[in-house]
Amino acid sequence: MFIGIVSLFPEMFRAITDYGVTGRAVKNGLLNIQSWSPRDFTHDRHRTVDDRPYGGGPGMLMMVQPLRDAIHAAKAAAGEGAKVIYLSPQGRKLDQAGVSELATNQKLILVCGRYEGVDERVIQTEIDEEWSIGDYVLSGGELPAMTLIDSVARFIPGVLGHEASAIEDSFADGLLDCPHYTRPEVLEGMEVPPVLLSGNHAEIRRWRLKQSLGRTWLRRPELLENLALTEEQARLLAEFKTEHAQQQHKHDGMA
């Protein structure tokens, strides 16, 4: 997969190219990340990339020419079929469904804004889609771009050590992940649930699904509103709710 980055701070992306899952993907040739800085496409000695906005107001805007030329260079390197994305608070909010959708593209170009944003004409002429990682303000598009890269890379075959990992991640099926445990079996009186030690894979799958449903109901109930639960899922969720109510009643009685 090819990902081009247009950013005033391309060195920030070493966090992606040099470390962890994405770093291994780059090293193994599964992920090709290249970057272009608009400063390299300026024509004045100060390498100016920003200017005051027409109409006044605080802050500066990224200028058209250096940014557009950097995008064109990234497009030329990517070849035909590259989708150009601008990381923007005005964009579609990134979720697991969106990540899965973006992962179907073999070529992405991510444009990172700075200052108060970019000239609207760049968006009109060069950008295919705008994406946001949340309703809050950041200093630039680099961190959102890194978030997008990390999440999309998990869908590239061979990137994860276990192919089931991406499937079993939180949100992969619209639910939060279930609890996980490793050694020791007992920690300060807290024991691993016996079913996980049973070796009964059918019961383990059932327990994990019940916990995933229950955790979603407790922490992100709005996610369940968009799901059409199967008969098994509905039954397991009902069981979880009953067990949770019993635990709460027991806890209240001990208080």
From Swiss-Prot:
Disulfide bonds: none annotated. SUPFAM superfamilies: alpha/beta knot. It is found in: Cytoplasm. InterPro entries: Alpha/beta_knot_MTases, tRNA_m1G_MeTrfase_C_sf, tRNA_m1G_MeTrfase_TrmD, tRNA_m1G_MTases_N, tRNA_MeTrfase_TRMD/TRM10. This is tRNA (guanine-N(1)-)-methyltransferase. It comes from Salmonella paratyphi C (strain RKS4594). One of its GO terms (molecular function) is tRNA (guanine(37)-N1)-methyltransferase activity. Belongs to the RNA methyltransferase TrmD family. Pfam families: tRNA_m1G_MT. Signal peptide: none annotated. Homodimer. GO terms for cellular component: cytosol. It catalyses: guanosine(37) in tRNA + S-adenosyl-L-methionine = N(1)-methylguanosine(37) in tRNA + S-adenosyl-L-homocysteine + H(+). S-adenosyl-L-methionine binds at G113, I133, G134, D135, Y136, V137, L138. Specifically methylates guanosine-37 in various tRNAs. The keyword DNA repair does not apply. It comes from the Bacteria. Its EC number is 2.1.1.228. Keywords: Cytoplasm, Methyltransferase, S-adenosyl-L-methionine, Transferase, tRNA processing.
